[in-house]
């Protein structure tokens, strides 16, 4: 503690510069000055979305990113772009001929436009779940039990068409039902 150490001072206008330079980030990590920055690593299967003061400002590519948080609120949302299974569990439904049946369906969905997905709905998966529920109800209620048993593939196609027509605004797609 008694040795003389050289200190370099570099002024950075954080009001004008949002992104933290890599050479500064390494030094800040080493000194644990993390309160002034928000950093994250966006994986290869993810899309990162940068929100500054609640406004979407940029889509982040895979890699390490850091931003000055002095004088502003920084939030980074990471959205998984891989197909995700979505299971609509045991719904009790009545067929056209008033027979009670229990329907379970698994769909695979994928986010194709992360900006739309982040801005369109608070929870895209919950919205997709409800859309699939409505589609199943519509397809089953219009048929008798015998028609349902004979036309399972047709019902899958109807459910997929119903959901596909409504999820474009959510930035998602159904890859398989």
Predicted regions, residues:
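N-terminal hydrophobic membrane-entry segments
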Residues: 1-177
């Amino acid at each position: 503690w008694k040795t003389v150490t050289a200190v370099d001072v570099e002024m950075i206008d954080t009001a004008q510069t949002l992104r933290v330079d890599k050479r500064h980030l390494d030094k800040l990590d080493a000194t644990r000055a993390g309160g002034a920055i928000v950093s994250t690593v966006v994986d290869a299967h993810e899309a990162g979305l940068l929100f500054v003061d609640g406004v979407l400002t940029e889509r982040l590519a895979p890699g390490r990113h850091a931003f000055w948080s002095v004088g502003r609120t920084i939030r980074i949302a990471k959205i998984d772009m891989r197909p995700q299974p979505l299971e609509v569990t045991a719904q009790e439904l009545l067929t056209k001929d008033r027979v009670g049946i229990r329907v379970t369906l698994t769909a695979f969905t994928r986010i194709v436009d992360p900006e739309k997905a982040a801005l369109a709905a608070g929870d895209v998966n919950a919205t997709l779940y409800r859309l699939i529920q409505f589609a199943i109800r519509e397809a089953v209620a219009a048929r008798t039990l015998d028609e349902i048993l004979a036309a399972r593939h047709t019902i899958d196609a109807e459910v997929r068409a119903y959901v596909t027509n409504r999820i474009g605004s959510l930035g998602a797609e159904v890859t398989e039902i």
